[in-house]
Amino acid sequence: MKLKNLMTELVKRNGSDLHLTGDSVPFFRVQGQILPASSEEYLTKDLFLDLEELLGPSKIQIFKEEKELDCSYGLDGIARFRMNIFLDRG
């Protein structure tokens, strides 16, 4: 799963934030600077599939209804992440 790989890499780089937008390259915030995490775009459909797998059906249902979700996710042995997910358009 690309999302878990990005989360792991963020921790390795001592980053504080992971910025994801569908059909765009992902970005890390490291020591206050926004840096590209990859040169490869994270397709919207792949991002949604990864979020569905990561969060599970109940949280995804809340996201679909409210168009936003604040939650946390623990990546075993790596870190706990606070997540703010929202739709910017539509």
Residue ranges and their predicted role:
Residues M1-G90:
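N-terminal "pre-motor" subdomain/linker immediately upstream of P-loop NTPase catalytic cores
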